[in-house]
């Protein structure tokens, strides 16, 4: 079995969770398999090694699980993007629309430098809303976001196209049909 097949087969699909009609892609089963977890980190690192990335940003909260080891393997700083009131220093905020309502993300004002070339890492690409908001934060601080990496992609939900429209190339290890 190749590494990507190992990764995909390690992700359990849970029908009708969290609501009827949704198939939840559960990364906890991937995390419970150290060989598959390491393969996912190694594949992202291999894609972005020697590409001029200066910082890795992870989005709350599952982006932390994959982003921190990617940053460590690349020898780069890791920056957190969090929900409101979770970061202790001065922050910049960005609100974004959800299916029903709105959410907000924050990052420290001093975490991105002018002209940083940032890789954003998250567990899953669905609609791209979280990464769009994250990119706005980074760009407001003078950083560049040209790439985002995901373990899972759900192409039917349009996230890849949304990110392309804002100048971000998405890299996904495995894809699943549907929601």
Swiss-Prot record:
Supply the PROSITE patterns for this chain: PUR_PYR_PR_TRANSFER (PS00103)
NCBIfam families hit by this protein: apt, PRK02304.1-1, PRK02304.1-3, PRK02304.1-5
- Give the Gene Ontology MF terms in alphabetical order: adenine phosphoribosyltransferase activity
Q: What PANTHER family does this protein map onto?
A: ADENINE PHOSPHORIBOSYLTRANSFERASE, PHOSPHORIBOSYLTRANSFERASE DOMAIN-CONTAINING PROTEIN
Recite the lineage of the species.
Bacteria, Pseudomonadati, Pseudomonadota, Gammaproteobacteria, Pasteurellales
Annotated EC: 2.4.2.7
Gene Ontology biological-process entries: adenine salvage; AMP salvage; purine ribonucleoside salvage
Q: What is this protein called?
A: Adenine phosphoribosyltransferase
Function of the protein: Catalyzes a salvage reaction resulting in the formation of AMP, that is energically less costly than de novo synthesis.
- What Gene3D superfamilies does this protein map onto? 3.40.50.2020
Under the heading InterPro entries, the entry gives:
Ade_phspho_trans, Adenine_PRTase, PRibTrfase_dom, PRTase-like
The annotated pathway is: Purine metabolism; AMP biosynthesis via salvage pathway; AMP from adenine: step 1/1
Record-stated family? Belongs to the purine/pyrimidine phosphoribosyltransferase family.
Q: Where is the signal peptide?
A: none
The alphabetical list of record keywords is:
Cytoplasm, Glycosyltransferase, Purine salvage, Transferase
Question: What are the subcellular locations of this protein?
Answer: Cytoplasm
Query: Which Gene Ontology CC terms are recorded?
Result: cytosol
Reactions catalysed, as given in the entry? AMP + diphosphate = 5-phospho-alpha-D-ribose 1-diphosphate + adenine
